[in-house]
Amino acid sequence: IRCTGSKECYSPSY
């Protein structure tokens, strides 16, 4: 799981 500097976490699914 990745989290951006904003406040969003998501799985590496591009």
UniProtKB/Swiss-Prot annotation:
Q: Where in the cell is it found?
A: Secreted
Q: Which domain of life is it from?
A: Eukaryota
Key words of the record: Disulfide bond, Ion channel impairing toxin, Potassium channel impairing toxin, Secreted, Toxin
What tissue specificity is annotated for this entry?
Answer: Expressed by the venom gland.
Is Membrane among this UniProt entry's keywords?
no
Q: Name one GO molecular function term.
A: potassium channel regulator activity
Main location, first listed in the record = secreted
Which terms in the GO cellular component ontology are assigned?
extracellular region
Q: What does the record give as the function of this protein?
A: Blocks voltage-gated potassium channels.
Quoted from the entry, the domain comment is: Has the structural arrangement of an alpha-helix connected to antiparallel beta-sheets by disulfide bonds (CS-alpha/beta).
Recorded family membership: Belongs to the short scorpion toxin superfamily. Potassium channel inhibitor family. Alpha-KTx 06 subfamily.
What other facts are recorded? This peptide elutes at 19.98 minutes.
Name this protein carries in UniProt:
Potassium channel toxin alpha-KTx 6 OcyKTx4
Originating organism: Opisthacanthus cayaporum
- What is this organism's lineage? Eukaryota, Metazoa, Ecdysozoa, Arthropoda, Chelicerata
